[in-house]
Amino acid sequence: MHGRKREEDPNPEETAAKALELRSLQSQFMSNHHQKIYTKEAIQLSAKLLITNPEFYTAWNYPKLAFESRLDEDSDPSLVNSIIDEELGVVQNALERNVKSYGAWYHRKWVLSKKGHYYPSLENELQLLNDYQKQAHQKQDDEKQDDPSRNFHAWNYRRFVVELTKTSEEDELQYTTDMISDISFTIYSAWHYRSVLVSSLVAKKADGFMPKETIRRELDYVHSAIFTLEEKQSGWFYYLWLLDQTVKMEIPLRFSSWPSDGSIIILSGPDCFNASSSTTKLTTFCSESGSFPLILYFDQAVSGVSSSTVTIGSELKDLVWEPVSDKKNSQVDSCVWVARLKFDCREPCFSRKETKVKVSLGGIVSSMGCNLTAPYEFVFTLRIHDTVEVELSQQESIVSWTDGFDNWDDNALSNDLNSLTALNADTGFEWRKKAIKIEIELFRTLPDSKIGKLILARLLMAEETMISNGVHYKEILQLYNDLMALDSWHNQYYKDEHSVALIHKVTSRTESMSRHLFRYRNMNNIICLRLNNLTLSRIAAVEKLLFVQMLDLSHNELHSAEGLEAMQLLCCLNLSHNRIRSFSALDSLRHLKQLRVLDVSHNHICGELPVDTTRYLCSSPLSNSGETGREVPNKYQDAYLVLRDLMKLKQLDIRGNDLIFAGEEFSSFVRQVVPKLVWLDGHKLTS
């Protein structure tokens, strides 16, 4: 177990005799337990059993019952203390047998927390625990022993005792310092406990624990651990936690939107998708329902976005904001929020053909506690375009991913490319940048190592998050390339991080992004972003891509479509020639209500229904308990759960996957689920 080889018993006869004695003890104990016998002899027998086998979890219930039977409200305090001492003694002896016995630690907590009784030596309990934990490191040299100083049970019990004794957090922080500095840099629980204490003290603004000084002091402290024992992980986990606090604590709440501030949007009816090339270079939004999405994307999950916190300064009233999330309750936190704005030429606000819309945000609080203290406004312009009648044959033409693209006009770059806005000013922003820069310079001086390269890459990404000038991406990408060559065991993780950095590099500057942008003239010059053939394994930076209507991610190494749910304008998506293994990996596409064209051909999508390992933990597209009125073949179940929400889908390509997705049966299934579908696998469906 836990990678340890089972050793052969050197004294099997002695072991057999002990087992026989243990069975005899258990038999006598169970008899006493069932008959509710709580005599002195019975209690002593249970104590002997627990000391012999602390893992006999059921046996820990017996002393609790015996304890209750021996006491009442009028019990003499000296008797109470005597019984408590006896119970604590049994627990201590049991812990000497097995320091990681859940039952022993829980029983000790139960004894000390008895209501109506006060254990006068409670103050000594913390000192005893101090001595126990500090002496435990002596067993570290014995490879056959677990290291008790890293015992999670003991540290959990410590927090319980600290609460009872009202010990200060400053004293406990000093205790972790003593444990780490005097005993071992590798005590993970001490580092974890330290992070909890530091967070609390900084949040309370305790004396000497302002963010700037505290983070700098803690960074200097953890350097001793990570540079002394570089191969040990405990200190590195704490360092990464500190890095996260340096970047995120009180960071400005940033957001992007569509439409973005200052943009001009042309609204038109459904047939504009099939109109011939337009002369305009402005964003055209075509709608079959007479509405368009107003999208807010925050860099932190927020809740409570509503008509009271986001107001529309025009005749458009009573917008309903919905989180782009699988959770159905109204209190959900989400980074992406969407409202549907109705437009109708008969309405007064649209009779002018051009309407300015002002959106004001205020009173929003993120899940990290970041307050939008000052209101923020942005304004965009809507133009109503007269719908042009298009012949039926043109409406049903197939969308090609190889022809019909024009280069992006550099002179027509819209505000959409630079729409990320800081909502809050952070008074500590400069010292945070300085702290990250100091760490970068420090890690540049270290000899080459896997952990050193990984931390340097994370530090450079952290600085890019703060300054957003794109100067570090080339180095970051090279670091992850080096790591993939050095450490094949974690190749997929490095590849994912490389993909994130690459997409951020592409979207960091208008010059680099414009090289991937095109206009698709066969659909009224909608905006197409082509990120194909980049070996991407993960999607990122979608907050900068909200304006994209056509996205080509073909010939990459993607395993899922996670992240695309924020791109509410997407009407055409190409995910062909990737590594997607099931329709459940496409679950995020259910939120793309404008999607008309989907290409998932030449992946590894199979018909086997995946096992839903999250069924009892969170909502899942594989949990089908709410489905009624429709019988779906089991082999198409996960396909149904995705396709049923793509009601505007007109073109689907799923060639080159499992054979069950070919043939008349699947064609019939798709036409039932997606009634507007016209093209399947490159062939036009007959009426």
From Swiss-Prot:
It catalyses: geranylgeranyl diphosphate + L-cysteinyl-[protein] = S-geranylgeranyl-L-cysteinyl-[protein] + diphosphate. Gene3D superfamilies: Protein prenylyltransferase, Ribonuclease Inhibitor. Its EC number is 2.5.1.60. The enzymatic reaction requires the aid of the Rab escort protein REP. The keyword Transferase applies. Keywords: Leucine-rich repeat, Prenyltransferase, Repeat, Transferase. One of its GO terms (molecular function) is Rab geranylgeranyltransferase activity. The keyword Membrane does not apply. LRR repeats lie at residues 523-545, 546-567, 568-591, 592-616, 646-668. It holds the Pfam family LRR_1. SUPFAM superfamilies: L domain-like (SSF52058), Protein prenylyltransferase (SSF48439). PFTA repeats lie at residues 38-72, 83-117, 132-167, 168-203, 214-248. It is an enzyme of class 2 (transferase). Heterotrimer composed of the alpha subunit RGTA, the beta subunit RGTB and REP; within this trimer, RGTA and RGTB form the catalytic component, while REP mediates peptide substrate binding. Belongs to the protein prenyltransferase subunit alpha family. Catalyzes the transfer of a geranylgeranyl moiety from geranylgeranyl diphosphate to both cysteines of Rab proteins with the C-terminal sequence -CCXX, CXXX, -XCCX and -XCXC, such as RABA1A, RABA2A, RABF2A and RABG2. Does not seem to be a functional Rab-GGT alpha subunit in vitro. This is Geranylgeranyl transferase type-2 subunit alpha 2. The gene is RGTA2.
